[in-house]
């Protein structure tokens, strides 16, 4: 899953991509091609 500042381009990568809001964060989910998953505004783990 990618951590992005903006999901503007992430939602246009595949026609089946959807934006979902969960627990105050925005997620892009794509059931047909899961490599396009993304989240906005979460710190990366090191």
UniProtKB/Swiss-Prot annotation:
Q: Which GO terms describe its biological process?
A: translation
One cellular component term (GO) for this entry is: ribosome
Which family does the record assign? Belongs to the bacterial ribosomal protein bL36 family.
> Does this UniProt record's set of keywords contain Protease?
no
What NCBIfam families does the annotation carry?
PRK00831.1, rpmJ_bact
Highest taxon of the lineage: Bacteria
Species annotation: Salmonella typhimurium (strain LT2 / SGSC1412 / ATCC 700720)
* Keyword presence, Ribosomal protein: yes
Show the InterPro entries listed in the entry: Ribosomal_bL36 (IPR000473), Ribosomal_bL36_sp (IPR035977), Ribosomal_L36_bact (IPR047621)
Which keywords does this Swiss-Prot/TrEMBL entry list?
A: Ribonucleoprotein, Ribosomal protein
Q: Provide an example Pfam family for this protein.
A: Ribosomal_L36
Q: What is the name of the gene encoding this protein?
A: rpmJ2
Q: Which GO terms describe its molecular function?
A: structural constituent of ribosome
Q: What's the name of the protein?
A: Large ribosomal subunit protein bL36B
For this protein, the record's PANTHER family field holds:
50S RIBOSOMAL PROTEIN L36 2, LARGE RIBOSOMAL SUBUNIT PROTEIN BL36B
């Amino acid at each position: 899953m990618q951590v992005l500042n903006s999901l503007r381009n992430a939602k246009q990568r595949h026609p089946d991509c959807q934006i979902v809001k969960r627990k105050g964060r925005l997620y892009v989910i794509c059931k047909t091609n899961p490599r396009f998953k993304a989240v906005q505004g979460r710190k990366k783990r090191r």
